[in-house]
A protein has these predicted regions:
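Positively charged n-region of N-terminal signal peptides that target proteins for export
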Residues: 1-4
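Bacterial N-terminal signal peptides
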Residues: 7-17
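Boundary of Sec targeting at the N-terminus
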Residues: 19-21, 33
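A short beta-strand-turn-helix
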Residues: 26-46
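Short pre-active-site segment immediately N-terminal to redox-active cysteine/selenocysteine motifs
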Residues: 44-47, 52-55, 124
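Structural microenvironment flanking redox-active thiols in thiol-disulfide oxidoreductases
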Residues: 61-101, 113-117
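Short, internal strand/loop/helix patches
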Residues: 98-134
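Thiol-/selenol-based redox modules, centered on thioredoxin-like
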Residues: 130-167
Length: 167
């Protein structure tokens, strides 16, 4: 019974999220530039938003796994990854060294007060959203298991195919 209820809640979350737009929260990137989250986009192509923290081992495993295939994903689909750090102010100085040390080519935004995290309804990290080319949330997922990044690119491919375009 618990599995059925959980499945219904997950499906409801996916259904509801497929119509939502990104909320407007002003964050800073790792270089201090202000960014309004409602204006995040990828030239009409899908993009991935990944909530993480420097101390979250599954988050870092997921972002490392994505980074290993990111160049291929970009070449094939034009997808962009935007990583949102929810590290609090006292740990924010650890984000840039983590990003640089791993060679992550992602756009990285800082959410030290968890304003965007709350606005997006994120309770657990890692949490990933896929946003379609029209700015609508097409998928939402919490947690990471090895190989889970393949599900992300498959969803991106589906969105591109549904729109009838490629990179």
């Amino acid at each position: 019974m618990k599995k059925i209820i959980f499945s219904i809640l997950v499906l409801f979350g996916i259904f509801v999220s497929s119509f939502a737009q990104l909320p407007s929260v002003v964050l800073k990137d790792i270089n201090g530039k202000s960014v309004d989250t409602a204006l995040l986009q990828n030239d009409g192509k899908p993009f991935i938003i990944s909530f993480f923290a420097t101390w979250c081992k599954p988050c870092n495993r997921e972002l490392k796994a994505i980074s290993e295939v990111y160049a291929d994903w970009q070449e094939e689909t034009g997808v962009k990854v935007i990583a949102i750090s929810i590290d609090q102010a006292q740990n924010i100085q650890k984000v840039k060294p983590l990003v640089d040390g791993n060679g992550w080519e992602y756009e990285v935004l800082l959410d030290p007060n968890s304003d965007f995290k709350r606005a997006m309804g994120v309770n657990l990290i890692p949490h990933v959203f896929i946003v379609d080319g029209d700015g609508k949330i097409a998928m939402s997922r919490s947690g990471y298991t090895e190989g889970g990044e393949e599900h992300l690119i498959e969803k991106v491919r589906e969105l591109i195919a549904a729109k009838g375009e490629s990179k």
